């Protein structure tokens, strides 16, 4: 790596650390690699960039120090096996949600399963699952036109169907009743509470769409509707997974149990050891 570029990155690391960013070194190198059109691991092989690079790099580092998300600045985020386009009008997929993806990949599904991803946002789960199961019919549902614009772009080259719909709508998509093999959901679930908001990172409170983050006072505004859809859409033996706040694991479990429609109801932890999602299997009998 050329001396001037190394010094610019080191200076950026200091600037980002002073802004309270814990991943300062990673972010500084990611920004440099993005602007240079290379991978982070190949920065050392670069020839000396021109003045335009250093001007743009300075601007990008300044934006990141204002806590503009790294993903907004580079325009993409990795999620499991795929790279997704993201921006200011869509929720940035988090590594925690990859735990659901890993769980699904370990399950047995029919050869051509029907998969629904509710609150799909950028299409993260839908697109990743379509790559994992290319013969599947995958439906991504969201009520945000902006989010679906990203989802459709990310779904190019796959069979993912993007549907604009509100999961709270009564009798939503009755044609799916009893036909779905796998239903996953990552709804907005952060409690809309001043105490909770005070501990969130600025990247969340200032840049993620509120509609995609906060799930009402207790974070569960959509959970009951999603559990109800799972009970209606899943075929007997179909699989269900819903992500939740680490403070609402027990209430989410209770919602699923109380339907009396599911077996094998389990809670799962994320990589940090926090309870993060609940899974269940639709009972073989349709009787409650």
Curated annotation (Swiss-Prot):
<dbReference type="InterPro" id="IPR040758">
    <property type="entry name" value="PrmC_N"/>
</dbReference>
<keyword id="KW-0489">Methyltransferase</keyword>
<feature type="binding site">
    <location>
        <position position="142"/>
    </location>
    <ligand>
        <name>S-adenosyl-L-methionine</name>
    </ligand>
</feature>
<dbReference type="GO" id="GO:0036009">
    <property type="term" value="F:protein-glutamine N-methyltransferase activity"/>
</dbReference>
<dbReference type="InterPro" id="IPR004556">
    <property type="entry name" value="HemK-like"/>
</dbReference>
<dbReference type="InterPro" id="IPR041698">
    <property type="entry name" value="Methyltransf_25"/>
</dbReference>
<dbReference type="InterPro" id="IPR019874">
    <property type="entry name" value="RF_methyltr_PrmC"/>
</dbReference>
<dbReference type="InterPro" id="IPR050320">
    <property type="entry name" value="N5-glutamine_MTase"/>
</dbReference>
<dbReference type="Pfam" id="PF17827">
    <property type="entry name" value="PrmC_N"/>
</dbReference>
<keyword id="KW-0808">Transferase</keyword>
<protein>
    <recommendedName>
        <fullName>Release factor glutamine methyltransferase</fullName>
        <ecNumber>2.1.1.297</ecNumber>
    </recommendedName>
</protein>
<comment type="function">
    <text>Methylates the class 1 translation termination release factors RF1/PrfA and RF2/PrfB on the glutamine residue of the universally conserved GGQ motif.</text>
</comment>
<dbReference type="GO" id="GO:0102559">
    <property type="term" value="F:protein-(glutamine-N5) methyltransferase activity"/>
</dbReference>
<comment type="similarity">
    <text>Belongs to the protein N5-glutamine methyltransferase family. PrmC subfamily.</text>
</comment>
<feature type="binding site">
    <location>
        <begin position="186"/>
        <end position="189"/>
    </location>
    <ligand>
        <name>substrate</name>
    </ligand>
</feature>
<dbReference type="Pfam" id="PF13649">
    <property type="entry name" value="Methyltransf_25"/>
</dbReference>
<dbReference type="InterPro" id="IPR029063">
    <property type="entry name" value="SAM-dependent_MTases_sf"/>
</dbReference>
<feature type="binding site">
    <location>
        <position position="186"/>
    </location>
    <ligand>
        <name>S-adenosyl-L-methionine</name>
    </ligand>
</feature>
<dbReference type="GO" id="GO:0032259">
    <property type="term" value="P:methylation"/>
</dbReference>
<keyword id="KW-0949">S-adenosyl-L-methionine</keyword>
